[in-house]
Amino acid sequence: MDFQFTHYQGNVSVKCSMEHIALANWFNTEVRSNSDKILTALSTAKSLIENQEKVLIGTEYTLFLNADEVMVRANNLAIESDEILEQDFHYYDEESLAFCGTQDFIHFLQSYVDFIA
């Protein structure tokens, strides 16, 4: 997972690789100005054991965490799988849904903590 933190005019923001845009959006809209939320997500991810799942609900995005994977999903992403779309139409959810390994997520958050130190 590729990402880059930048500091501009007193704010830290992150850019992520295309398949992880939802993770960047989560960070930039939900937690960048709230270190408690970052530390909560980091400690939650670090404390997960096998077959354990945690959910962290935010205003715009929700995190679904287990020992192997983290899913970031926009709260407004409500797709009914039985809903029929016109031919050649597809849902665009690249900015609303992202998956990464739990260790990658921990590395991402720890990199932020190191970046602001």
UniProtKB/Swiss-Prot annotation:
Pfam families the record matches: UPF0231
InterPro entries per the UniProt record, alphabetical: UPF0231 (IPR008249)
Top-rank taxon, per record: Bacteria
Species classification: Bacteria, Pseudomonadati, Pseudomonadota, Gammaproteobacteria, Pasteurellales
Similarity comment: Belongs to the UPF0231 family.
Protein name: UPF0231 protein HI_1724
